[in-house]
A protein has these predicted regions:
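Core subunits and conserved enzymes of cellular information-processing
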Residues: 1-220
Length: 220
C-alpha cells in the first residue's frame, strides 16, 4: 500500500506541471488574440483617420485655390485695393512745343498726351501681366472708357488732366521702355515728358463707381 501511495504521489507530481503549462499557454494565446484584434482595430482606425486627413488637406488646398481665384477676379473687377510690387508711369505734355517750334505741316496737338496714348500704355501694362491698373486713381476695369473731347480727357466718366499718373501692380515691365516701343516713340518723336519708376510697394485703389454688369459676358 505504501508503495502504491508513493507511485500515485510521483505521478501527480509529474502531471500537475503539464496542467499548469497548458493553462498558462491558453492565457497567453487568449491575450495574444486580444492584442491582435486590438491592433487590427487600431490599424483600421488609423486608416480611416488618414482618409479624413487627406480629405481635409484636399479641401484646404481647393479652398486656397478658390480664394486665390477670387482675389484675381476681384482685382480684375476693381472691387478691392491691390498693393504690391509695381510701376508708376507719369506722362505730361511737351511744354516746349509751340506753334512756331513744330515742323511745318505738323499739328501742335501731337505734342500733347491724348487718350490713345493712355490706351496704348494701359494695353502694354495688361500684356505685361498687370493685375491692377489706374489712371489718376481711376481704376481700370473691363467696362472702363477712356475718351477725349477737345482738351478734356475722361476716365470712367471722370475728368482727369496732366500729368497723367498710371499705376500698375503685378507683371513684368522690363520691356516697357524698349527702344522703338510706344513710350520711346512718344519721347523721341514728340518730346512727351514720361517717367517710369519701378517700386516695391504700389497701391492701386479700388473702383469707386457702380459696376454695371448688364452687358457683361463670360470670356470665351
Amino acid at each position: 500500500n505504501s508503495t502504491n501511495k508513493k507511485d500515485i504521489k510521483i505521478k501527480k507530481n509529474c502531471i500537475c506541471p503539464d496542467y499548469a503549462n497548458n493553462d498558462l499557454r491558453d492565457q497567453v494565446l487568449k491575450s495574444k488574440e486580444k492584442y491582435d484584434n486590438a491592433f487590427a482595430e487600431l490599424e483600421k482606425v488609423n486608416k480611416e483617420l488618414e482618409k479624413y486627413r487627406t480629405k481635409v488637406t484636399d479641401n484646404d488646398s481647393s479652398a486656397s485655390e478658390k480664394q486665390e481665384e477670387l482675389k484675381k477676379d476681384n482685382a480684375i473687377l476693381g472691387l478691392n485695393d491691390v498693393t504690391g510690387e509695381g510701376i508708376i508711369v507719369t506722362l505730361d505734355d511737351n511744354k516746349n512745343a509751340s506753334v512756331s517750334s513744330v515742323t511745318a505741316g505738323d499739328d501742335i496737338s501731337n505734342y500733347l498726351v491724348h487718350e490713345i496714348d493712355l490706351l496704348k500704355i494701359v494695353n502694354e501694362l495688361k500684356n505685361a501681366g498687370a493685375i491692377a491698373i489706374s489712371i489718376n486713381d481711376q481704376r481700370i476695369i473691363p467696362t472702363t472708357s477712356i475718351n477725349c473731347a477737345g482738351n478734356i480727357t475722361r476716365v470712367n466718366g471722370e475728368i482727369v488732366g496732366t500729368p497723367f499718373v498710371i499705376k500698375a501692380v503685378g507683371g513684368s515691365f522690363d520691356t516697357l521702355e524698349r527702344p522703338g516701343g510706344y513710350i520711346d516713340w512718344l519721347r523721341e518723336d514728340y518730346g512727351i515728358d514720361i517717367t517710369v519708376k519701378k517700386q516695391s510697394n504700389v497701391t492701386v485703389e479700388k473702383y469707386n463707381g457702380v459696376i454695371n454688369f448688364k452687358y457683361a459676358q463670360e470670356a470665351e
